[in-house]
Regions:
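Residue-level signal for the membrane-embedded core of alpha-helical transmembrane segments
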Residues: 78-85
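Hydrophobic alpha-helical interface/terminus motif in multipass membrane transporters
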Residues: 4-5, 17, 54, 87
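Membrane-interface segments at transmembrane helix junctions and kinks
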Residues: 16-29, 48-75, 97-200
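Alpha-helical multi-pass transmembrane bundles of energy-transducing inner-membrane proteins
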Residues: 1-14
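Conserved catalytic core of Hanks-type protein kinase domains
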Residues: 7, 47, 90
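Transmembrane alpha-helix interface/packing and boundary motifs in multi-pass membrane proteins
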Residues: 34-43, 126
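Acidic glycine-/aspartate-rich tracts in secreted/extracellular proteins
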Residues: 36, 94-96
Length: 200
């Protein structure tokens, strides 16, 4: 987000952006990777960390566990909605930006791009290479840390939870992204009322 603000002359209003995918390609790729990891896209880091928390909450035999699970699922939906709203409004939607912002737009300089690339690599690969520590029985780390306490044995139940229940967060994530796209298209049409904004 900082790279985008910096590249568009400190503009922070999403409604005054749009159409910057060709002007800020590196920023677009980094924000896309970060957003996908944040919403728990399969096989990215956020997928492993988010889903294991929700599954453990679901299999905890208490009303608090069930409430926590559904609250987390709602959070996954909201996260997907606002993350993809950011991408659509900033990069993909028809531009509503000031002419000066477009003419002077520039992608992130090297000193800003390098840390983003390091974080992007971590977002893509860290969850995959560390997944056994959280999702399986194949490593001493899993056996010696997570299940040391009797209370943490519920994480074993999460391994064998119903697939249909495990897929709920993923479906809500997809629903959030689709609704974001539909509402943005609606709002920028002549009858849009959700994010209606008249540029001056």
């Amino acid at each position: 987000a900082g790279c985008i603000i910096h590249g568009l002359m400190d503009e922070q209003d999403l409604r005054k952006m749009g159409g910057t995918i060709r002007l800020l390609p590196m920023s677009y790729i980094m924000i896309l990777i970060g957003s996908l990891a944040l919403v728990g896209f399969p096989f990215l880091t956020g997928f492993y960390s988010k889903d294991v928390i929700l599954e453990v909450a679901l299999t905890k035999p208490s009303s608090v566990g069930n409430f926590t699970h559904w609250l987390g699922c709602f959070g996954a939906f909201c996260t997907s909605f606002y993350s993809f709203r950011l991408i659509f409004l900033t990069f993909i939607n028809t531009t509503s930006s000031n002419k000066d912002y477009i003419e002077n737009a520039h992608d992130a300089p090297v000193k800003m791009a390098v840390p983003l690339m390091i974080l992007a690599v971590g977002s893509i690969f860290w969850g995959f290479f560390s997944r056994d520590a959280f999702l399986g029985f194949g490593t001493p780390l899993f056996m010696n840390t997570i299940t040391t306490s009797f209370e943490n044995l519920v994480s074993i139940d999460a391994e064998f939870a119903s697939s249909s229940l495990k897929n709920i967060p993923f479906f809500l994530t997809v629903l959030g992204s689709v609704l974001s796209f539909l509402l943005i298209n609606c709002s920028f049409s002549s009858k849009g009322v959700v994010f209606d904004y008249k540029m001056t």
